[in-house]
Amino acid sequence: MGNYSTKIDEKWQKKWEENSLYKFNNDNLDKKLYVLEMFSYPSGSKLHAGHWFNYGPVDSWARFKRMQGYNVFQPMGFDAFGLPAENYAIKTGIHPKDSTFKNIETMETQLKAMGAMFNWENEVITCSPDYYKWTQWLFLKLYEKGLAYKKKAPVNWCPSCNTVLANEQVLDGKCERCDSNVDKKNLEQWFLKITDYADELLEKLDELDWPEKTKAMQKHWIGKSVGAEVTFNVADSDLSFNVFTTRVDTLFGVTYVVLAPENDLVDKLTTPENKAEVESYKTQAKNQSDIERQSITREKTGVFSGSYAINPINGKKVPIWIGDYVLNTYGTGCVMAVPAHDERDFAFATKYNLPIERVIEGGDSLPYTEYGKMVNSGEFDGLFGNKAKEAVISKLESMNLGRKKINYRLRDWLVSRQRYWGAPIPIIYCEKCGTVEVPIEQLPVELPYNVEFSPDGKSPLGKCDDFINTTCPKCGGPAKREADTLDTFVCSSWYYLRYPDNNNEKDAFNPELINKMLPVDKYVGGPEHACMHLLYARFITKALRDMGYLNFDEPFLSLTHQGLILGPDGLKMSKSKGNTISPDDYIKEFGADVFRMYLMFGFDYTEGGAWSDDAIKSIGKFVDRVERILENAREEIKNSKDNKSTMDKDEKELNYVRHHSIKSITEDIDKMQFNTSIARLMEFTNALSKYLGSDTLRNASFLRESIIDFITLLAPFAPHFAEEQWELIGINSSIFNEKWPEFDPKALIKDEVEIAVQVNGKIRAKINIYTSSSEDEIKESALNNDDIKNSIGDKEIKKVIVIKNRLVNIVAK
């Protein structure tokens, strides 16, 4: 066992804190590098290995950047509002505020034990009034700009959590928090108009250095569709409805239309003889989530309304059906069905024996979903693709029955929550004045402590008289506060703006400072946030820009998703499975640097993998070996009279590995390829060991230069251990104030190389040659090799092919 332990961790953590080593320099913003990991939610009592996998390697990357000369800003905080703390309180009786702050205290201690260079003086905690005051300010600014509004709407309702869920929080028809089946409910809710920014949210994506999969997920979620809106009149009625389609060229093939069960027209056009069946179907559909209804694997169902619509392009009557696979929240809540050219429509038509009429040429069988020439389409026969679409739209426009239209899958962001542990919405309701904003000077609207928050489907704050009853700021009369709280994603949608200016009591942030500090240069967190937090933060940034507070378009220039650390059994860690990995025990046994290095070497950072106790022990042995080698090197330097100053073969060999390591590690760590970086360090370690173990006289000054570079390269990955080794070689300043080494291209040019010699295509020997050797000299060396002579024997040499510095192939018969 070596000397490295948690005592060394504690020693250097204390020194770093005493010397304010990582304090951000606000006077040097030209070289600023804003590095941010998604902050932790303090729902559990402690950080687990997954948190470390997010924070530890990113800290190593930030240290590397600091040594490259960047002024690194790396803050930390806690996303502290939300359902888990409230559910825990209901279960245990411990108040959310008490459990949250206790957990934060524990996690702060753990994060400091990691040795990360977080700027703790910039910490934010979203459940603190000095933070959510400005979350409320943000809501009011959005409200003033018409980007926040309240309306009655069908919402996702979790009967277990007793609260509304955003579409993004429903996974396969179940609540992402408690896995309960999600219902539908009509409630007055607050929304943010993210749809106003749909186009820009799409357009700017391609400019970002983000994973392609994440950009694709956001594009799909926004779901821009370019098509046409077509008007269908209801037969024998003055009713009409519009449908959106991207394939208006198939309009002649419409054989039925389908309305969502929630569509307001359903009751009006359902005939008396079909009413009972339609009502029963509506009730059934109400219990299905939007995601379930849209599932491609689920069999489509529907009922006939009894009414017919008129196809505007050919005047044919088509039946109007009610189907739950149509969503009232998407498009117009009505779709035209072309079973010959749409798989879903084809399956529905086949099931209910509805007509199927080909109107696009192509394919041996139906449905044919590709583009082709229009057929059975009257005057439009023979037209193809965009020309066909334009011609049909032009005809519809001339009849005032259609127009070009762009549609989006994206819905406005529902932010109301009927729960306690969240930021109160700063709105007051007065019988005389109506809806009134809480004046800025009265913020924050503080969350009261003594509240009965057992879930009953109603907002807990509505049951707290001291909170709910207030005075109207306009007329001074009696009024009521908004009882709902804000979705916790509102709190996290802007936290990156607060970090650099977290003690500002007058404003959410100082625009002059923030516009120099932002955007975030490197953002790291899980891919599960692609269509929620990451999208919301982009929206809020653009909204604040348009209000004049920000001069940039995007919050996060570069994004990396870390992988998932699984339990030793290869399954996702969970307390119920008993496969969680607590960092504390391993740090106590091995030290923080061994734990950190294992996470970086044992896994591809963007993929993760299963935990292995054997693998972390191997890293512990590697650190012990490095310690012994560096101790031997120090002794060699100390005892040497430095009577050798030449760079002979052994020195050149080590120097090659040294500079190859500098080059490779610099490139790999920059791309967060930590595992290959540490592999290069291991190669450098082997080269040092070989040099120290050789029998020849050693160059002490060269050896010192080599171990200085080695420790410098090691520093981001093992910060405490590297500082200790740095001190032991007699350097008093912190290694993290050192400049990152640069490789010498000349050192990568070898005097000698080993090449293979083949006889008739099979390798028979390897020889060392000078890189400056001529082709004839290489041939001579190969032919004079004893193994080659034996291999050729009595055969006649027909040809000798030389690929310089790589290969010799001898053809002999």
UniProtKB/Swiss-Prot annotation:
GO cellular component: cytosol
Record Pfam families: Anticodon_1 (PF08264), tRNA-synt_1 (PF00133), tRNA-synt_1_2 (PF13603), tRNA-synt_1g (PF09334)
PANTHER family, per the entry: LEUCINE--TRNA LIGASE, MITOCHONDRIAL (PTHR43740:SF2), LEUCYL-TRNA SYNTHETASE (PTHR43740)
Motif position, 'KMSKS' region: 572-576
Protein name as annotated: Leucine--tRNA ligase
Cellular localization per UniProt: Cytoplasm
Cited InterPro entries: aa-tRNA-synth_Ia, Leu-tRNA-ligase, Leu_tRNA-synth_edit, M/V/L/I-tRNA-synth_anticd-bd, Methionyl/Leucyl_tRNA_Synth, Rossmann-like_a/b/a_fold, tRNAsynth_Ia_anticodon-bd, Val/Leu/Ile-tRNA-synth_edit
Gene this chain is encoded by: leuS
Top-level division of the source organism's lineage: Bacteria
Known catalytic reactions: tRNA(Leu) + L-leucine + ATP = L-leucyl-tRNA(Leu) + AMP + diphosphate
'HIGH' region, short sequence motif: residues: 40-51
Family: Belongs to the class-I aminoacyl-tRNA synthetase family.
Coiled coil: none
Any GO BP: leucyl-tRNA aminoacylation
Taxonomy of the source species: Bacteria, Bacillati, Bacillota, Clostridia, Eubacteriales
Keywords: Aminoacyl-tRNA synthetase, ATP-binding, Cytoplasm, Ligase, Nucleotide-binding, Protein biosynthesis
Record bears the keyword Protein biosynthesis: yes
EC numbers, comma separated: 6.1.1.4
Main location (coarse class): cytoplasm
Chain positions recorded as ATP binding sites: 575
Species annotation: Clostridium botulinum (strain Langeland / NCTC 10281 / Type F)
